[in-house]
Amino acid sequence: MKFFLDTAFVEEIRAAKEWGILDGVTTNPTLVAKTGKGFMEVVQDILNIVEGPVSIEVVAQDAQGMVEQAQQLRRLGEQVVIKIPATQEGIKAVKVLSQEGIPTNVTLIFQPLQALLAAKAGATYVSPFVGRLEDIGHDAMDLVFDIKNIFDNYGFETQIIVASIRHPKHVLDAARMGADICTVPFKVMEQLFKHALTDRGLEQFLADWSKVPGRPF
């Protein structure tokens, strides 16, 4: 499974890259707004750091506007992936962009038929939002399970990006189901490393090591 970082903060991206596990980045207008910086400045900074796919969202609501914004964004770099909402106009735009060879990430997916339509239109990725579904009382991982089965049934090459990750259990469940990618907030990514017994064991090892005579380091 690949790991994308769901952020627009370059400090977080640099840290994850240093860990050696960063495969890409996803952004959205909300994340960019949180930086307090200009849109193009944020995007260019991210593209200068990340070698893998970087999802950047259009804000137009009509298909033609989405396509025009997508074409403009794609000129920023080959790693740019266009985030498109799972609407009728969005799916129309995905079809056009797929024919132009521009990769797309269909976002705000909350039911499996949206993912099916996106894949039919040629989407490169689909992003089911599990955290937001849980917020309204749904078993969100059922959505990922259904999308994975549908894609396997029909041989779609569209990859599943599990998004709106709230805790490590979401990542674990996604990995168990065979999702292609998880896009994870930085704070959750940090939690993936942690276990109390790891810390306790390391503390004990270091304490014991300090008692070893003639230590080389």
From Swiss-Prot:
Pathway where it operates: Carbohydrate degradation; pentose phosphate pathway; D-glyceraldehyde 3-phosphate and beta-D-fructose 6-phosphate from D-ribose 5-phosphate and D-xylulose 5-phosphate (non-oxidative stage): step 2/3
Keywords: Cytoplasm, Pentose shunt, Schiff base, Transferase
Top-level taxon in the UniProt lineage: Bacteria
InterPro entries xrefs: Aldolase_TIM (IPR013785), TAL/FSA (IPR001585), Transaldolase_3B (IPR022999), Transaldolase_3B/F6P_aldolase (IPR004731), Transaldolase_AS (IPR018225), TSA/FSA_arc/bac (IPR033919)
Gene3D superfamilies referenced in this protein's UniProt entry, alphabetically: Aldolase class I (3.20.20.70)
Positions annotated as active site in the UniProt record: K83 (schiff-base intermediate with substrate)
Record's catalysed reaction(s): D-sedoheptulose 7-phosphate + D-glyceraldehyde 3-phosphate = D-erythrose 4-phosphate + beta-D-fructose 6-phosphate
Enzyme Commission number: 2.2.1.2
Location in the cell: Cytoplasm
Main location: cytoplasm
GO molecular function: aldehyde-lyase activity; transaldolase activity
NCBIfam families: fsa_talC_mipB
Function in brief: Transaldolase is important for the balance of metabolites in the pentose-phosphate pathway.
Protein name: Probable transaldolase
Taxon lineage: Bacteria, Pseudomonadati, Coprothermobacterota, Coprothermobacteria, Coprothermobacterales
